[in-house]
Amino acid sequence: MIGDWESQSQITNPQCPITKMIKRLTVRNYAIIEHLEIRFPEGLTIITGETGAGKSILLGALGLIMGERADLKSLYNEQEKCVVEGIFDVSAYDIKPFFEQNDIDYDLECVVRRELTPSGKSRAFVNDTPVNLDVLRQLTGSLVDLHLQFDTLDIHNVSFQLRMID
């Protein structure tokens, strides 16, 4: 679920081994989730479960903090705002210039938050600084690498092959 900085981003530090990147994911008022907090341990985390257990809902919540489109239908309680927050350990990586370029406070832990109000307004924050979705996508695109069930089928797609070669 969490990817390798070197292969996914220009924000790299090849001398540092990959460490635990996502520390915590908090989800409030999203789909069937009233409130959920997941603290990720060191090492590999695999989320499994039967059909209907909520794995895709968890990925949908993660998608919100990655800048994906928000949908009012995903509110658990339509009278309250939805909040998804991820805390990432970025201490091993040289990403301070990205924060400076975007006028965001830098810390060794990066807090990424997305809020969706019942009126449909969506707001994104990095370390409590409001950011637009492009900045959010750029940052989280470096922090998160999702691999889904049928991703291996892309290898047969010519445009995917060309992107990998280029």
PLM-predicted stretches and their roles:
Residues 1-19:
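Arg/Gly-rich low-complexity intrinsically disordered repeat tracts
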Residues 24-164:
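Gly/Lys-enriched N-terminal cap/neck module of very large, oligomeric protein machines
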